[in-house]
């Protein structure tokens, strides 16, 4: 804990909210980095970036007392504006966050858009490797214009529930140098324009991809998304903030009818992808699905946030993303199994069993111990919210899993 304690003694905190966020995030992120073998330089560098570039944009620190009045982020069921995750296959910690502006929810900033450029400026000043070219292209197409923002604000109250927002960032903590990507949610733009979310994003990608480098996988995804089972809905996308020729574009969807058959449909694009690698990955994905025993059935997307301090009030849809890459005719799937609402002890047991079957001895031995160290105040025999989702992908003959975690 030395880097956290050292920085806590020397860094100034301009207000109580930022100090509270630091005391919540700092120990958790540090313990996660230490458990994954980050060296001391990387620990200081990454905590320093959180202090400088993230804490000022997290808004009110969530409490039971302010839960009804604070701005709720689209990122998490509890409306928390930052969501850590751990790529346990590669030992990489990451987090996504939605910058929260000082005037959020008022007439000055009804959709929480005013702070985006200020936060982005801070990130680019911190790391000059960030390339904002594609971020700017998609911002101009998927964020509201000033006129649309005014129009939207006068049409009535919009339910800014889980998954219903505008924009966020994700940070991969690779050693001492982070990697960044931007998220764009198309739901509000769809309401304003009357254009379905999927079409908004697909059209934006085609316009930006002027050389047609990802036309093949994009065409295949568009055809599938119009016919996928389980009430599939494309809802947001992400883009790497690197040189455009090296950037990955990912399209995200929600499958509202959760089932084993739906998982197969997402992974194979309704049978359109049937390569040996795809089938090998599918076998492992279904093994994980069978272990977790997530109840099948319909899930609503028209939901409100859960209340801080209270157990989950619902279960969530299956999430998926497809990576679109030049030179790949098929979109590359990553399916998120979402056991949010099931006992955390059950989820941990299932994951350990999966690790043991893969021969991941160290991971199977340490997973529960490490998870408990990240959240020392949580009773994992009672909690049902910490391990929100488990993402699964399969690349070059290997499964890759990430665990998405709720801080509250």
Swiss-Prot record:
Pathway: Secondary metabolite biosynthesis; Alkaloid biosynthesis
GO BP term, pick one: alkaloid metabolic process
Binding positions (dimethylallyl diphosphate): 94, 181, 183, 248, 250, 252, 334, 336, 400, 404
Reaction catalysis annotation: preechinulin + dimethylallyl diphosphate = tardioxopiperazine B + diphosphate; preechinulin + dimethylallyl diphosphate = tardioxopiperazine A + diphosphate; tardioxopiperazine A + dimethylallyl diphosphate = echinulin + diphosphate; tardioxopiperazine A + dimethylallyl diphosphate = variecolorin L + diphosphate
Assigned EC number: 2.5.1.-
Alphabetized UniProt keyword annotations: Prenyltransferase, Transferase
Top-level taxon in the UniProt lineage: Eukaryota
Alphabetized GO MF terms: prenyltransferase activity
Class in the EC hierarchy, top level: transferase
Pfam families, per the entry: Trp_DMAT
CDD domains: PT-DMATS_CymD
Function statement: Prenyltransferase; part of the gene cluster that mediates the biosynthesis of echinulin family alkaloid. The pathway begins with the biosynthesis of the cyclic dipeptide cyclo-L-Trp-L-Ala (cyclo-TA) by the NRPS echPS via condensation of L-alanine and L-tryptophan. The prenyltransferase echPT1 then catalyzes the first prenylation step, a reverse prenylation reaction at C2, to yield preechinulin. Preechinulin is the substrate of the cytochrome P450 monooxygenase echP450 that catalyzes the formation of the double bond between C10 and C11 to produce neoechulin A.
Family, per entry: Belongs to the tryptophan dimethylallyltransferase family.
Name of the molecule in the record: Echinulin prenyltransferase 2
Organism: Aspergillus ruber (strain CBS 135680)
Phylogenetic lineage: Eukaryota, Fungi, Dikarya, Ascomycota, Pezizomycotina
Gene: echPT2
């Amino acid at each position: 804990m030395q880097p956290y304690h050292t920085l806590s003694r020397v860094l100034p905190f301009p207000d109580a909210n930022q100090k509270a966020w630091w005391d919540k995030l700092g120990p958790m992120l540090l313990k996660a980095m230490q458990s994954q073998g980050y060296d001391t330089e990387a620990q200081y560098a990454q905590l320093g970036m959180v202090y400088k570039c993230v804490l000022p944009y997290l808004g009110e620190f969530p409490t039971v007392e302010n839960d009804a009045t604070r701005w709720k982020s689209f990122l998490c069921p509890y409306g928390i504006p930052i969501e850590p995750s751990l790529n346990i296959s590669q030992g990489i910690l990451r987090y996504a966050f939605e910058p929260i502006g000082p005037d959020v929810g008022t007439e000055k900033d009804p959709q929480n858009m005013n702070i985006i450029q200020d936060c982005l400026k801070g990130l680019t000043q911190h790391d000059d490797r960030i390339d904002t070219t594609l971020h700017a292209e998609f911002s101009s197409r998927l964020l509201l214009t000033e006129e649309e923002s005014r129009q939207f604000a006068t049409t009535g109250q919009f339910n800014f529930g889980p998954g219903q927002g505008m924009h966020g960032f994700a940070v991969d903590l690779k050693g001492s140098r982070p990697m960044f990507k931007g998220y764009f949610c198309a739901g509000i733009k769809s309401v304003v324009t009357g254009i379905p979310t999927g079409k908004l994003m697909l059209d934006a990608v085609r316009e930006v991809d002027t050389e047609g480098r990802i036309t093949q996988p994009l065409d295949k995804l568009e055809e599938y998304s119009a016919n996928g089972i389980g009430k599939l809905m494309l809802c947001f996308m992400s883009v790497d903030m690197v040189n455009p020729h090296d950037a990955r574009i990912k399209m995200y969807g929600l499958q509202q009818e959760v089932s084993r058959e739906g998982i197969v449909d997402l992974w194979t694009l309704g049978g359109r992808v049937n390569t040996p690698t795809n089938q090998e990955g599918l076998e492992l994905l279904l093994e994980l699905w069978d272990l977790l025993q997530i109840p099948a059935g319909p899930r609503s997307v028209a939901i409100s946030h859960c209340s801080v301090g209270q157990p989950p009030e619902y279960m969530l849809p299956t999430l998926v993303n497809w990576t679109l890459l030049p030179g790949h005719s098929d979109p590359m799937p990553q399916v998120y199994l979402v056991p949010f609402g099931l006992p955390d002890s059950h989820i941990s047991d299932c994951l350990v069993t999966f690790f043991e079957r893969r021969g991941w001895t160290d991971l199977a031995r340490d997973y529960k111990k490490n998870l408990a160290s990240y959240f020392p105040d949580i009773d994992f025999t009672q909690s049902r919210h910490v391990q929100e989702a488990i993402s699964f992908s399969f690349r070059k003959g290997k499964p890759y899993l990430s665990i998405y975690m709720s801080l509250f």
